[in-house]
Amino acid sequence: MRVLPRLLLLLLLAFPAAVLLRGGPGGSLVAAQDLTEDEETVEDSIIEDEDDEAEVEEDEPTDLAEDKEEEDVSGEPEASPSADTTILFVKGEDFPANNIVKFLVGFTNKGTEDFIVESLDASFRYPQDYQFYIQNFTALPLNTVVPPQRQATFEYSFIPAEPMGGRPFGLVINLNYKDLNGNVFQDAVFNQTVTIIEREDGLDGETIFMYMFLAGLGLLVVVGLHQLLESRKRKRPIQKVEMGTSSQNDVDMSWIPQETLNQINKASPRRLPRKRAQKRSVGSDE
């Protein structure tokens, strides 16, 4: 009889242990609770990520607005939406050093109010930093009123410096204008990096001057030689040859009076010097 109570006690202790080891209803409840808690944690993390993305999206427009405000405060005036501009380089987009570059700027007023075009300017800038000026050209004052739905064309020219040849520079061409309310606008008609071309023709001022100097020097040498030859010819004496009268037929006797001619004919004719010399030589031989 004493053994039976002990067996019952062992059964009572062994049954709960077996239930716990097999994962009974209590164990499945604990596991379900753990899964529920994990799902809630994942959902919370997803919700937090969505909230962060929404905050980022909300911050981006704010940053853009701040950038625009900074540009409005520190930047230059912008172009008017009621105006349109075009540019045309007369000799193409070639920029030879120490040579005239000419272009035309067209302005179109698409609005309902007048625009006053004030000036047109151009400048060369450092390619990596457009705030650094390399060569700033004189602004061309225009002061031209352009009515609505009308167009105007302006001409401008500049000369790139000769030492800039063979290097790239940023070319900025600005058209400055305003409306009747006093609002100032600025349109960057051309804002690109260009390369200045070196002149290869070689016909610069120094070369032309050298050619002219050599031509003048050659002309002086030719004139000097000509004068020297002329002076030598003048120094040589000219030998005069005495020409006698070979016959009386070569002499015009019409101007002599007839009486004088009769007397000359009556008189004995003079012997020529050659005949006398011949007679003398014959007499000496005898």
Swiss-Prot record:
Keyword field contains tRNA-binding: no
Keywords linked to the UniProt accession: Calcium, Endoplasmic reticulum, Glycoprotein, Membrane, Phosphoprotein, Signal, Transmembrane, Transmembrane helix
Chain intervals with Acidic residues compositional bias: 37-75
PTM description: Phosphorylated in its cytoplasmic tail.
UniProt-annotated location(s): Endoplasmic reticulum membrane
Notes on the domains: Shows a remarkable charge distribution with the N-terminus being highly negatively charged, and the cytoplasmic C-terminus positively charged.
Name of protein: Translocon-associated protein subunit alpha
